[in-house]
Each structure stands twice: as C-alpha cells, then as structure tokens.
Regions:
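C-terminal accessory subdomain/extension
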Residues: 84-178
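Active-site loop/helix belt of alpha/beta enzymes
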Residues: 1-71
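Hydrophobic core residues within well-ordered beta-strands of beta-rich domains
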Residues: 71-73, 109
Length: 178
C-alpha cells in the first residue's frame, strides 16, 4: 500500500493533478484497515461484499457486527414430482459439457424452479432451508430436492437462497431476475 501512495505522489508531481482519491482495494483489505496498518492516504475501499453479504472475503467467515441474511434470491416452484434419484437409462454430458454424477437416495420429491444458469450459477446459491438440496440447473430451470423441506411445498411455493457475491452479481444484472 505504501508503494501505491508513492505512485500517487509521483503522478501528482508529473501531472500537477491533486489525485486526492486512492482506491486501495476491496473487502479483503478491511482487516488491514481495522488493524490501523493501512496508510492513511488510502481513502477508498470497495467493500460491497462485506457490507451487503456480511462476509470476510479472505475466508468467507461472518464479518463482525454484520448480518449474513440481508440478501435472498427467491424463485418459485413450477413443477413438483416424486422421482427416482438415479435417472433411467444412459446419461451423458449436460448442455454445459459436464458429466453429472448421481447418488442413489431412492425416490425423492424434486422441484423445478423458474431460475436457471442464464441467471445464476447454481453453485452460487445456498438454500435458506437446510432440507433443500440444489441438484443442478438447465439454462432456464433450477432443480431442487425438496424431500427434507422444513415446510410443505407445492407448485407456486417460493424457494429462498443466499447468494455468494458472484451469485448476487449475476442475479442483480440479469434482465430475467427482478
């Protein structure tokens, strides 16, 4: 960070511009700032993840005195059926070139929700209900195992997730999510 301040000073000398704003990093730099070891000239940090999601970006632990439940991605169940956890017949690559593996858990209550990979990567969503399991997604739909849901579900039930920062970015910029 000291080098960044030196570069600002060199640019000031070379251009005559004030350059009062020095952006020194993002949420990962908060521990440095909080410890008092960040140069005082660093006067701007981009700390959206720490403020909005309440997470320390170095290890994803909760940031002190913040909440981790401030943002939810909400989708709706559009199809709900009991299905075997293992598909019948041969399987191959999905539409995204991935070979999906399946675990035999018997017959499960499977929901199709109106949110898909065009909106968010399913790995960037954590179900609020620990009984929900994200199984995967197509372009348009998210597939969720609802068998161990804390509450009864039906078509039209809202399903809630906590996003990662990448998930928040994707859903916030998707024209299909509002």
């Amino acid at each position: 960070m000291t080098r960044l301040v030196q570069l600002r000073d060199m640019a000031r000398a070379a251009t005559g511009l004030e350059l009062d704003l020095i952006s020194g990093g993002n949420s990962a730099n908060l521990p440095l700032m909080m410890s008092g070891t960040m140069p005082s000239e660093i006067n701007n940090l981009r700390i959206g993840e720490a403020i909005i999601l309440g997470r320390n970006t170095l290890d994803r632990s909760p940031w002190p005195q913040t909440r981790q439940d401030t943002v939810e991605v909400v989708t709706e169940i559009i199809e709900l059926e009991r299905k075997p956890s293992i598909p019948l017949g041969r399987t191959g690559e999905d539409a995204f070139g991935q070979h999906v593996t399946f675990t035999d858990r018997g017959t499960r209550l499977r929901a199709i929700c109106n949110l898909g990979r065009q909106d968010v990567n399913p790995s960037d969503l954590t179900p609020v209900d620990p009984g929900h399991i994200v199984l995967g997604a197509s372009s348009d739909h998210l597939i969720v195992d609802m068998t161990d849901s804390a509450e009864s579900v039906e078509i039209g039930t809202e399903v809630r997730f906590r996003p990662t920062y990448a998930g928040l970015l994707a859903t916030a910029t998707s024209s299909a999510v509002w």
